[in-house]
From Swiss-Prot:
SUPFAM superfamilies for the chain: Alpha-L RNA-binding motif (SSF55174)
Keyword Nucleus: no
Name of the molecule in the record: Small ribosomal subunit protein uS4
Protein's UniProt keywords contain Flavoprotein: no
CDD domains, sorted: S4 (cd00165)
One of the record's GO molecular function terms: rRNA binding
Subunit-level organization: Part of the 30S ribosomal subunit. Contacts protein S5. The interaction surface between S4 and S5 is involved in control of translational fidelity.
Pfam name, any one: S4
Length: 205
């Protein structure tokens, strides 16, 4: 197993949940966290502990976003009009690596980040190599023609584990995607329960 895969599955084990719904997740075989103390019985979490876990799970799901960057999403979420939890999910789903993952151009969100960073993606005809780039409604996201035969892309085309959400328009022949609206948390096909309002509460303490 690669170091990247090990880190990914360590997140699953720490959360005690298969947060991406992957068949090879270690929590499909055991229900304790990583490390020598992982098998200890866990007591009931405090409010702080519950909020912290919700934050770690959401950060982990989107590729273990850095704390500094995640806090910026919180600040923007509370600045925008409407429900802050809804706003937080909307921002995360607009990340370019999240769009590439949702469109099924690559098999994992970790692969999506690397794919974007390596310059394989265009937005409105221009190359963008920043995974955290926020896509707008109507933007056209495209896999570069020279990158469409990369093995990881070919493998992703065979995926049957997840469907493309209805807030995207995706053409897998042309390898293009477009976000048609900003999703609400209930629209996002998370394999496990995400609680963005607990994340907002965590940072609002």
């Amino acid at each position: 197993m690669t170091k990247r895969a090990e880190a990914k599955y360590k997140i699953d084990r720490r959360m005690g949940q298969n947060i991406w719904g992957r068949p090879k997740s270690p929590v499909n075989r055991r229900e304790y966290g990583p490390g020598q103390h992982g098998q200890r019985r866990k007591g009931k979490l405090s409010d702080f502990g519950t909020q912290l876990k919700a934050k770690q799970k959401l950060k982990g799901y989107y590729g273990n976003i850095s704390e500094k960057q995640f806090r910026k999403y919180y600040a923007e979420a509370i600045r925008l009009r409407g429900d802050s939890g809804d706003n937080l999910i909307g921002l995360l789903e607009r990340r370019l690596d999240a769009v590439i993952y949702r469109a099924k151009f690559v098999p994992t969100v970790f692969a999506a980040r690397q794919f974007v960073n390596h310059g394989h993606v265009k937005v409105n005809g221009k190359r963008v190599n920043i995974a955290s780039y926020l896509v707008k409604v109507g933007d056209v996201i495209e896999v570069k023609e020279s990158s469409r035969e990369i093995l990881i892309v070919l493998e992703a085309k065979q995926l049957a584990e997840r469907d493309v959400p209805d807030y995207y328009e995706v053409d897998h022949n042309k390898m293009t995607a477009k976000i048609t609206r900003i999703p609400l948390p209930a629209d996002v096909p998370y394999p496990v329960l995400m609680e963005p309002n607990l994340v907002i509460e965590f940072y609002s303490r």
